[in-house]
């Protein structure tokens, strides 16, 4: 369709920083009844945009969202910082462990739904949480783990560096009518130290880091905080 509209050199040649389209990202919920299409472009505008949108939704009615993501930087990072919604909503909705979650174009969300539910239920099982517990959810993303744990504890303190994810997390808490969770946009290692200095009660820390793993500063922070704030069984 893009080629037939005469858009010319559409493919992004990373080496020469040329072209228009870098990636096409497809996100879907586990029922496959809501789909998001993210067009990662090197600029904000797309020729024949309305026709392209009409063709997509005509052929695929389950598409609820079409978004342009702008990434004109040299490198292999897939998504840029700016998102422009050109059709439908800014998100799709999925259900996990009985809760509903909004998923945006830049939101981290596990792709294997069945195993994700197994994993999150295992977190609850091995956490041995009590109703009086205060739990930190580091790298919380859109709030999935923290919101699932929230019904088992007194309060969840969640921290995430991505602002869009925090906005989605707050909306997810509201939509699921969960009030005992607090979200902060900050570096996890800095926020945990801040909470510790505020003498926040901490009974457990849940960490779900990005692919590169935990920041070494975070591990040092958890190690330091654990000796003054966590019980021995929780540290183990």
What are these regions (language model features)?
Residues 1-7, 11, 229-236:
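Single conserved hydrophobic/aromatic residue that forms the stacking wall/gate
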């Amino acid at each position: 369709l893009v080629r037939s509209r005469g858009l010319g050199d559409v493919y992004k040649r990373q080496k020469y920083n040329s072209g228009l389209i870098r990636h096409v990202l497809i996100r879907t919920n586990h029922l496959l009844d809501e789909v998001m299409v993210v067009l990662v472009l090197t600029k904000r505008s797309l020729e024949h945009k309305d026709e392209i949108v009409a063709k997509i939704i005509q052929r695929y009615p389950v598409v609820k969202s079409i978004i342009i993501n702008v990434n004109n930087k040299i490198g292999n990072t897939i998504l840029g910082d700016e998102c422009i919604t050109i059709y439908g909503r800014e998100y799709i909705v999925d259900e996990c462990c009985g809760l509903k979650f909004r998923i945006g174009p830049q939101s981290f969300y596990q792709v294997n739904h069945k195993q994700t539910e197994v994993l999150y239920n295992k977190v609850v099982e091995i956490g041995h949480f009590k109703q009086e517990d205060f739990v930190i959810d580091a790298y919380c993303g859109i709030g999935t783990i923290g919101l699932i744990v929230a019904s088992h504890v007194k309060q969840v303190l969640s921290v995430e560096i991505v602002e869009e994810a925090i906005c989605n997390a707050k909306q997810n808490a509201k939509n699921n009518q969960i009030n005992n969770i607090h979200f902060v946009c900050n570096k996890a290692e800095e926020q945990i130290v801040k909470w510790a200095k505020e003498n926040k009660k901490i009974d457990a820390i849940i960490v779900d880091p990005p692919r590169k793993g935990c920041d070494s500063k975070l591990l040092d922070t958890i190690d330091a905080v654990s000796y003054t704030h966590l019980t021995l069984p929780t540290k183990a």
